[in-house]
Swiss-Prot record:
Gene that encodes the chain: prp-5
Residues involved in ATP binding: 605-612
Disulfide-bonded cysteines: none
UniProt name for this protein: Pre-mRNA-processing ATP-dependent RNA helicase prp-5
InterPro entries: DEAD/DEAH_box_helicase_dom, Helicase_ATP-bd, Helicase_C-like, P-loop_NTPase, PRP5/DDX46/KHDC4_KH, RNA-helicase_DEAD-box_CS, RNA_helicase_DEAD_Q_motif
């Protein structure tokens, strides 16, 4: 016998090289003269399986030792042949591994103590015969090792094929309903008796009573033969084969252990098992009787007769119903894979089942291969009729098992009508179709698809089947089946809704009414002694001296006059002193007491008046009074700004105070990496300075777990007028709605138009409004100059101003404002050519570049900065002396903030504005600012303002306030619409279903407008002899309706109108034949190619891309070839808004002529299609085009 690959036998003593040569010679001899014995050459694990089983069954010592030596185990070290040898196991095994060869008979040595070694073939034959007798008994199943069972199992891929293959059988008589009912009652009675027996055993029933019970059971069994005991090593008794073939049915108590212990150890040549079906007239489900009957027919099966099912299946150690449970599991899998059955699920109470009737469904996955092997054995042999009969018996047995379980579980009191959908019997069982095999993964997925419950999870096919088959009894489902999520996942609408919700960046809403929040202290104001004795007259005089402070509200504190009266802590006062702030500014004098008292404040003050310190110092006192921020707590104070530059500036201003008070401040704004800001927030921060967009991103990030506003009690909106503009208002309100209601809100700005008041008041409670120097007023320290000039003279004047500025002092800064990003870069290039060191900043630049540019400008690295209006708010540069508005601002607030970049903190500055004659809309705001600040208005500017007001009154122009807009939500919708149009344009074949059907409303409106325009441009098809009146009537017909014009001679007279129309037609026909063309006459081709029918399509007012689509040679040639018509472009092109005058050529149109109405209609419809597609493409291109083709806003 060939040495096994995993043999652990020691190598013989001697030289390794010599041994290698001997082995090589031995291989040669084996190949040359070795006998051919395929059975012995086979390395199938069957031999080892039965050796292991024999060893377990307790064979005598001689056989056990011989088997062990045949295994070449490590125990053979004690043999004389291997004494003194050294092991070279690794090298020997690696060399012999994978070689299934035979030893030559002439080289067989007497080195083994096993006398039966030479007679292995005979012994193998006897063992094979004994295996047939042993297989199927209780001990053969229970004592088989698990690894042997794993080796015997077939591959999972062949399971379905084996189950579908028919087997031999003999015809049997079907059971009647009465017999089935009686059988079920007997089984139920047997189960109850078994439970009673089990309880009796637990109560320590005497052994005598047990033996008596066993004797009674044996008498009732009438000599039925069962398998031998589990631990009996004795051979099968020959008397067992002579038992009666058809014993009486077993009606007593059914105890498998007792039967197995007291039965005679008999074995039939045909493997049997309790619970198998007898092919005679034995009823399904009578295990003992069936086993006895099959055992009685063992000799016939051994002699070659194929009238018996080959059911060589082991008996489970957990009960005698293991086989039926396995078959039942297979049937359930077939139910899951069927297409015609619908299984309803419902929750039921799980019963307390006996061990023998326990459902093995949870372990079905472990026994799938074994069950498939059993069904294959049943359907293995016999004629076609036998296999069909075997299929029927298996089906009945599965139905019986299911009915039995339903009776035992008592799901419902009513009878169960569950039908098991089994596979039909193959018509040609010998030729199996491999393609019909069900893949295991497909079967598993098919089973999962049926777990969905409810009406929403049913497909159309399931609904039709349900109507066809009627109501089907529900089936229980358990907690492991997750039906809800699977049903939601299969709904495409829910997927789209979930995707859109995820993309929307929603902030998690917080219901503060259900939270137990710690109370906060907002009132820290204690009125100083010096202010308490001040009278009302003195107070009014003081406020007038302080730049005319105006306040509105109730119980307003009196303004302070020095830092010591503000109630600030010592570290804050020390920091103020170190920064060189001698005394508070007017806005600080009045705002600090009001904010310290816990009131909501609206502060309006001129630019450069110290508004940042007015809300920052009370904020520090507010934060220090509360508990420290720990864990997942959010910030206590939140400051929101409209621009990134202002955000960084406030962050820099707070750093000295935060360092002194050991507070953490985080600046969160767009353009920088969000991961760094998230990391800082995770470490904890008491103060956040942010822009609204980035703050929403942080609040919505990771489901709201990055940061939150639960502890935010101090909110500041700097430049509040722009924050509450319609561009920011939706985002700001979304943030306010997630802050606790008892917050303190502070709003500051240099300009506060009345249009914003309504928005600010809805987020404030009993606010105090403080105005210093008036609303939207330029500081008096700023000298304002307005010059009206042409566009070409601006640059020379700019060079002149810069030359005058830097001629006296080099260490000054100048800021130039322009309207557009392109203009900023162009002006930067021109100034660099003239030798001026400058830099530019606008929204198209990267945020890092913007930050570095501002820093270099403040340090004096570049003295000149060119910027758009993003630098108009909050930018504070100490040495900024000159502000030039190269492009005039279009509203008052923008002018005030631009001019306010100079003349800050009491310093002086100059603001120069260039305005052209065409910018009359800007003249009104600039003139108003000059008047409010007490400076003279130039005469030319005043004339422009008056002219603009007259245009507004006449309705020729519309005055704009500089505020309003549709907000970022409108921008998001526009981007989404453009993206969907791009997807439709570039989608591949088969992707039609991926596009949203509910396109944005703008697309629908655009299509409708295009359709209406085309309809108005298309004329009806008329004949050459049709009248003008008739043509006009056809123009009145709704678009798309193509009607044929008919000759006047073909019309039927139907009254006075018809006669009049006929007369007009004849007159027009005579005029046309005479060649007398009249203005507006639709047909103007009198050449030889003129057709009997014609139509016109006006294309003058359509976009250029649409006109090109219907006039280029390629498209026209295709239409001519397809229709055989004549297509001519007529008329002249007129720009939008212009109309052709009397006697001029009409607008550009296309004339289509043909011999028949059909060809003209076909050509007209094709041209209409091209015109529509061109119009839509032009609209899409226009919407996709960025506002500036050079930069991308990040």
């Amino acid at each position: 016998m060939a040495r096994l690959r995993d043999s652990r036998s020691p190598s013989p003593a001697g030289s390794l090289s010599a041994r290698k040569r001997k082995d090589d010679d031995r291989r040669d001899r084996d190949r040359r003269d070795g006998p051919v014995d395929h059975r012995r050459r086979s390395r199938s694990p069957i031999d080892r399986r039965y050796r292991d089983r024999d060893r377990d069954r307790g064979r005598d010592g001689r056989d056990r030792d011989s088997y062990r030596r045949r295994d070449r185990s490590i125990d053979r070290r004690d043999d004389d042949y291997y004494r003194g040898s050294r092991r070279d196991g690794d090298r020997r095994r690696s060399r012999d591994r994978g070689l299934d060869r035979l030893r030559s008979p002439d080289r067989r040595r007497d080195r083994s103590r096993d006398p039966d070694r030479e007679y292995r073939p005979r012994r193998d034959d006897s063992r094979d015969r004994a295996r047939v007798r042993r297989e199927g008994t209780a001990e053969s199943s229970s004592h088989r090792r698990d690894d042997v069972r794993a080796r015997d199992q077939p591959k999972p891929g062949n399971t379905t094929a084996k189950e579908n293959e028919p087997a031999k059988s003999t015809p049997t008589q079907p059971q009647t309903e009465a017999e089935k009912k009686a059988e079920r009652l007997r089984k139920l009675q047997a189960m109850k008796q078994k439970h009673a027996l089990k309880e009796a055993k637990e109560a320590d029933v005497t052994a005598g009573l047990t033996r008596k019970l066993f004797m009674e059971m044996d008498q009732r069994a009438s000599g039925a033969v069962v398998g031998s005991g589990t631990n009996s090593p004795a051979p099968a008794s020959p008397a067992a084969a002579e038992s009666p073939a058809s014993p009486a049915p077993y009606v007593g108590k059914f105890d498998p252990k007792a039967i197995a212990r007291n039965a005679k150890p008999a074995r039939a040549s045909s493997p049997v098992r309790l619970g198998d079906v007898k092919l005679g007239d034995v009823k399904v489900g009578a295990p003992v009787a069936a086993a006895a009957s099959i055992a009685g027919q063992g000799k016939g099966a051994a002699s070659g007769k194929a009238g018996l099912l080959q059911t060589g299946r082991p008996i489970s150690t957990f009960g005698f119903n293991k086989s039926a449970d396995a078959l039942k599991t297979t049937a359930k899998r077939k139910i899951d894979m069927g297409d015609e059955e619908i299984i309803k699920r419902k929750l039921v109470k799980l019963p307390d089942l006996a061990l023998e009737n326990a459902d093995d469904t949870p372990y079905a996955d472990d026994d799938v291969a074994e069950d498939a092997e059993k069904d294959f054995d049943v359907l293995l042999a016999g004629t076609e009729e036998d296999r069909a009969e075997a299929q029927r018996l298996l089906r009945e047995r599965r139905e019986e098992q299911i009915q039995k379980e339903s009776m035992a579980m008592e799901i419902d009191s009513a009878p169960s009508n569950i039908e098991v959908a089994t596979e039909p019997v193959a018509q040609n069982p010998t030729a199996m179709d491999v393609d019909d095999e069900v893949d295991p993964l497909d079967a598993f997925m098919a089973g999962l698809e049926q777990t969905a419950s409810g009406e929403e999870s049913h497909s159309k096919a399931d609904t039709l089947t349900e109507k066809k088959n009627g109501n089907i009894p529900p089936e229980a489902y358990f907690s492991d089946d997750d039906y809800g999520y699977e049903a939601d996942g299969t709904d495409p609408t829910s997927i789209l809704a979930m995707a859109s919700k995820k993309k929307k960046k929603d902030i998690p809403t917080i219901d503060y009414s259900k939270l137990d929040l710690n109370p906060i202290r907002k009132n820290f104001w204690v009125e100083p002694y010096e202010l308490s004795h001040m009278s009302e007259e003195e107070l009014a005089e003081l406020r007038l001296e302080l730049d005319g402070i105006k306040v509105s509200g109730k119980n307003i504190p009196k303004p302070v006059q020095k830092w010591s009266q503000c109630g600030l802590t010592r570290p804050i006062l020390d920091t103020i002193e170190s920064l060189g702030f001698e005394k508070p500014t007017p806005i600080q004098m009045q705002a600090l007491p009001v904010i310290m008292s816990g009131r909501d404040v609206i502060g309006v003050a001129k630019t450069g008046s110290g508004k940042t310190m007015a809300f920052a110092l009370p904020m520090l006192r507010h934060v220090k009074d509360q508990d420290p921020v720990t864990g997942d707590d959010g910030a206590i104070a939140l400051i929101m700004t409209p621009t990134r530059e202002l955000c960084t500036q406030i962050y820099s201003d707070l750093q000295p105070f935060a360092k002194a008070l050991k507070l953490r401040v985080v600046a969160a704004y767009g353009g920088n990496a969000i991961k760094d800001q998230i990391a800082e927030l995770k470490r904890g921060a008491e103060i956040i300075v942010a822009t609204p967009g980035r703050l929403i991103d942080l609040l919505a990030a990771n489901g709201g777990r990055v940061t939150n506003l639960k502890r935010a009690t101090y909110l500041v909106l700097d430049e509040a007028d722009r924050m509450f503009d319609m561009g920011f208002e939706p985002q700001v309100m979304k943030i306010f709605n997630n802050v606790r209601p008892d917050r303190q809100t502070i709003l500051f700005s240099a300009t506060m138009p009345r249009i914003i008041d309504a928005l600010t008041k809805k987020v404030l409670r009993d606010p105090v409004e403080i105005t210093v120097g008036g609303r939207s007023v330029v500081a008096p320290e700023i000298t304002q100059i307005v010059e009206v000039m042409d566009e070409g003279k601006k640059f020379n004047r700019l060079l002149e101003l810069l030359g005058e500025l830097y001629a006296d002092d080099d260490d000054v800064r100048s800021l130039i404002f322009v309207e557009r990003q392109e203009k900023a870069d162009d002006l930067l290039r021109e100034l660099l050519r003239r030798g001026y060191g400058c830099m530019s900043i606008h929204g198209g630049k990267d945020q890092e570049d913007r930050n570095s540019t501002i820093s270099d400008f403040k340090k004096g690295v570049c003295p000149i900065l060119i910027a758009t209006s993003i630098a108009a708010r909050g930018l504070d540069v100490k040495q900024l002396k000159l502000v030039i508005n190269y492009d005039a601002p279009n509203h008052l607030e923008d002018y005030v903030h631009r001019a306010g970049r100079t003349g800050r903190a009491g310093n002086t500055g100059t603001a120069v504005t260039f305005i052209t004659e065409e910018q009359e809309n800007c003249a009104s705001g600039i003139a108003k600012a000059l008047e409010q600040s007490g400076q003279p208005v130039p005469d030319r500017l005043n004339e422009m303002r008056k002219a603009w007001k007259e245009k507004v009154k006449a309705g020729k122009a519309k005055d704009a306030s500089g505020f309003g807009g549709k907000g970022l939500e409108k921008l998001d919708k526009d981007r989404e619409a453009a993206r969907m149009r791009e997807r439709k344009t570039h989608k591949a074949e088969g992707e039609e279903d991926d596009v949203k059907e509910d396109a944005p409303a703008e697309d629908g409106e655009k299509k409708d407008k295009t359709k209406v325009a085309i309809q108005s441009a298309v004329s009806a098809i008329v004949s050459r002899d049709a009248s003008k009146a008739e043509t006009e009537d056809k123009h009145a017909i709704p678009a798309g309706a193509v009607k044929a014009g008919h000759h006047a001679s073909s019309g039927k007279s139907g009254g006075a109108l018809d006669k009049a129309a006929s007369a007009i037609s004849e007159i027009n026909a005579r005029l046309a034949r005479a060649g007398q063309l009249r203005p507006g006459q639709p047909i103007d081709n009198k050449g030889p190619d003129a057709g009997a029918f014609h139509a016109t399509l006006e294309i003058n007012d359509f976009p250029q891309k649409a006109r090109w689509a219907v006039t280029n040679r390629t498209n026209v040639a295709k239409i001519l070839e397809a229709t055989g018509t004549s297509i001519t472009t007529k008329g002249n092109y007129y720009a939008p808004g212009k109309e052709p005058g009397p006697g001029q050529e009409p607008k550009l149109y296309i004339l289509i002529e043909g011999d028949t109405e059909v060809v003209v209609g076909n050509a007209l419809s094709e041209l209409t299609r091209l015109l529509r597609e061109g119009t839509m493409a032009a609209a899409d291109a226009e919407s996709r085009a960025p506002a500036s083709g050079r930069y991308t806003i990040t």
